[in-house]
Every structure is written in C-alpha cells, then in structure tokens.
C-alpha cells in the first residue's frame, strides 16, 4: 500500500524518465523508489527469502521462497498518465506460484490470489468468464514493442483473433490484463515471450 501511494502521488507530477536501451523501454525514478520500498518491507519480514525485482536485480539466499517484483507494470502508461499501470508482486515456492498481488493504482483496485485460496478484487471473490464460445469473447494481448520479430508474430495472431471474436485490446500492463481475465471481464490473454507462467488458463484459452 505504501508503494502504491508513492506511485499515485508521483503520477500527478511531471515525470522524468530514461530508456533502458530501447526508445519504448522506459524507467522512472518512481520505479526505483517503489522497488526499494517494496524490497525493504519484504526483507524486514522475510530476511531469508530470495527476491527478484525489475529495477534492483536479484539476490540468491537459497530459500525455497522467491518474491518477484514489478514496481510499476506499465511504466510507459505511467509516464503518459494513461490509466493502466499497477504494482505487481508474486511469491513462488520451489518454483511454483503460491501468492500474487496486483494493485491497479488508477482505479484503486487490489487483486489478490493464493494457491487453494481463491481470487479476489478488493476482498470480493472473482471468477473467470462463463462464456463457452470463443467468438463471443473479448481478448487482451501484449507484446514487446521494440522487437520486430515478435511484433509480426503477435500481429498475425491478433488479426486471427480479431476476425473471430468481439475484439482484442492491448492496454500495456500484462498483470492487469491477466487480472481482468481472472475477473471475467475479458475471456483470455495472449502474449509471446512471457518470462514466467503466472496465470491459469480460462475456460476458453488454450
């Protein structure tokens, strides 16, 4: 919550940023500050756990538990005040996801899920869509905007889905996209080059 408040306050100001190699791969000082704050809190409560964070790198304490942190998923949106960005944190036990939290900051919506414990939005249970026909669904996607090969691959898939469904959206924050699948407001999420499998398939996705 403290990191989310830091990001919320920063979103109201003019933001300086730099690119991490490619023109559309941005990082802000707020990314770094939020990452430091989250990492500090985890270390205070779980000093023996491994931590992998987008801006600060990783440690390796040989723990069965590993925390994955993206302090601002959707940094480009954050820079442009486009209201789709979130704090995303996951916990893995022996390589398997057991807890996930995604905080949709512009909409003040906190998603939470735990293995065997269900999925929630602001303490209300959520579930995936009940639709049984692919062509009745709305879908979301993401792709790395600075890799031409993967853009081309994604565009072909997007074209096929778009022609056979209610459409495809790309909002620029994959963690929120997958939460929207979990909430049932879209039917599936597609992306090439996901580094870690962090979502279960919906009724309609392969």
Show which residues each predicted segment covers.
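An extended, acidic
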Residues: 127-199, 203
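Generic detector of well-ordered alpha-helical packing
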Residues: 32, 36, 55, 71-74, ...
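N-terminal subdomain of lithium-sensitive/metallo-dependent phosphomonoesterases centered on the IMPase/IPPase/PAP
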Residues: 1-72
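Residue-level signal for inorganic ion chemistry
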Residues: 7, 31, 42, 75, ...
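DPxDG-like acidic metal-binding loop motif
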Residues: 61-120
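Short, solvent-exposed loop/turn motifs
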Residues: 97, 125-127
């Amino acid at each position: 919550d403290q990191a989310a408040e830091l990001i919320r306050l920063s979103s109201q100001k003019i933001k300086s940023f730099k690119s991490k190699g490619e023109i559309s791969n941005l990082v802000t000082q707020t990314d770094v500050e939020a990452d430091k704050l989250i990492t500090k809190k985890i270390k205070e409560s779980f000093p023996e756990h491994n931590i992998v964070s987008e801006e600060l790198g990783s440690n390796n304490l040989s723990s069965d538990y590993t925390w994955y942190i993206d302090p601002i998923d959707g940094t480009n949106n954050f820079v442009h005040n486009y209201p789709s960005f979130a704090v995303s944190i996951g916990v893995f036990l022996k390589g398997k996801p057991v807890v996930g939290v995604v905080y949709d900051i512009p909409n003040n919506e906190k998603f939470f899920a735990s293995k065997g414990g269900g999925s929630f939005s602001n303490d209300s249970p959520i579930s995936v869509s009940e639709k049984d026909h692919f062509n009745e669904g709305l879908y979301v996607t993401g792709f790395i905007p600075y890799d031409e090969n993967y853009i081309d691959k994604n565009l072909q898939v997007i074209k096929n889905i778009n022609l056979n469904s209610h459409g495809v959206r790309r909002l620029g924050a994959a963690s929120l996209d997958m939460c929207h699948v979990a909430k049932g407001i879209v039917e599936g999420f597609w992306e090439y080059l996901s580094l870690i499998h962090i979502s279960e398939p919906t009724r309609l996705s392969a």
